[in-house]
């Protein structure tokens, strides 16, 4: 253990309380000194000079209130040019989420507390319980005081929770009454989701489809099988420089352009600012190839691209091995911390969905075929545009 008394400050460090904030909320930075034994030494805010790169805003002590949105860096300077740097973000609020969106109170006079988090357009969340405006749809059933709901009568109502232009709802049922239906929560559009149309503008255009091959045991009409595959294939090959088939594909005729097909093993493509990684995860890390994790980290580092797209057969939350899912997400988080734009495109099931969490965009592309051998009428593909000014994408129903 280090028991030496604190000495002179030899260097400084900086830590962030709220690295990811949203408009109207502050980020708190703490600057501290370190002596030669790494003892931590208090430094007052007035003794530190702050420079912010990439953002305007105002300071109050160690708290910074951004006046815009985006990513930025804070450079703290103390004494004889000792400096430390911290990165932070301030992105628009995309949606609100209640910790418990459906609650029950047994008796009149009972209470429950409502807790709300706000998530920005990059999927980072922070608590806003004390900032939310609460509105009870039917005050005869209950009232709000702060974030506490008190039941006044048997029945069911919902509480509207509003902040930063977004709303979410909490249904409250008292005394075992029939539950009422609350409106759907609001949400802001993903700023990266835009119309993608191939042009001769120097950008790289990439299309991704889900699984086109039928792998079930049902009976499939041959004419329907060929027609549906050809239809999706034509859409995937249109308006792109490269097509990625994100699942088993039994079309043997050559594509009209460059292509990459998922085959259950590791594959990597480095092309014009984008790193595309094909992974197999459905059998778990012990039954597939665990070396693929080491391989893609090396390949991505060597490529040095700002856009990283993973194409896999399962979304990480559905991995057979929870440890593998956690390990994968830790790697994804590292890329986000480095400022990369990261997509995880899973190809499974019969539904399209998309969500953003902790800076990673998770998108699922449904299979072309249902388990019984009938064609899925809810088929989507993804279109990407990757250029020096960033990446945009568009989900397209085929």
Segments from the language model and where they lie:
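Conserved beta-strand scaffold positions in the cores of enzyme catalytic domains, especially
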Residues: 243, 258-261, 276, 344, ...
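Divalent metal-dependent phosphoesterase catalytic cores across multiple superfamilies
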Residues: 175-265, 295, 323-341
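Extracytoplasmic soluble-region selector
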Residues: 1-194, 210
């Amino acid at each position: 253990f280090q028991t030496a008394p604190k000495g002179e400050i030899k260097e400084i460090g900086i830590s962030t309380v709220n690295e990811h904030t949203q408009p109207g909320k502050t980020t708190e930075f703490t600057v501290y000194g370190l002596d030669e034994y790494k003892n931590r030494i208090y430094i007052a805010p007035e003794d530190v000079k702050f420079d912010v790169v990439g953002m305007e805003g105002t300071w109050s002590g160690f708290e910074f209130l951004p006046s815009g949105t985006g990513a930025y860096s804070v450079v703290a300077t103390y004494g004889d040019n000792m400096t430390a740097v911290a990165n932070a973000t301030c992105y628009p609020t995309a949606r609100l989420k209640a910790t418990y969106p459906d609650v029950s109170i047994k008796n009149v006079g009972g209470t429950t507390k409502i807790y709300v988090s706000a998530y920005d357009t990059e999927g980072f969340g922070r608590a806003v319980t004390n900032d939310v405006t609460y509105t009870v749809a039917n005050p005869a059933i209950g009232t709000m005081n702060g974030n506490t709901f008190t039941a006044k009568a048997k029945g069911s109502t919902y509480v509207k929770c509003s902040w930063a232009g977004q709303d979410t709802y909490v249904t409250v049922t008292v005394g075992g009454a029939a539950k009422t239906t609350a409106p759907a929560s609001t949400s802001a559009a993903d700023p990266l989701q835009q119309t993608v149309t191939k042009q001769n503008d120097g950008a790289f255009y990439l299309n991704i489809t889900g699984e086109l091959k039928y792998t079930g045991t049902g009976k499939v009409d041959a004419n329907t099988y060929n027609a549906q595959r050809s239809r999706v294939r034509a859409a995937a090959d249109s308006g792109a420089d490269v097509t990625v088939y994100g699942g088993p594909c039994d079309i043997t005729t050559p594509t009209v352009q460059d292509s990459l097909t998922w085959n259950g093993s590791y594959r990597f493509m480095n092309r014009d600012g984008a790193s595309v990684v094909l992974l197999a995860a459905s059998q778990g890390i012990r039954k597939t190839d665990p070396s693929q994790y080491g391989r893609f980290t090396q390949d991505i580092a060597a490529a040095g691209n700002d856009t990283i797209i993973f194409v896999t057969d399962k979304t990480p939350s559905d991995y057979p091995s929870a440890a593998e899912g956690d390990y994968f997400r830790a790697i994804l988080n590292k890329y986000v911390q480095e400022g990369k734009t990261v997509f995880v495109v899973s190809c499974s099931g019969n539904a399209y969905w998309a969500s953003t969490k902790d800076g990673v965009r998770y998108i699922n592309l449904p299979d072309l075929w249902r388990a019984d051998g009938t064609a899925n009428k809810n088929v989507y593909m993804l279109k990407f545009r990757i250029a020096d000014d960033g990446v945009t994408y568009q989900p397209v129903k085929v």
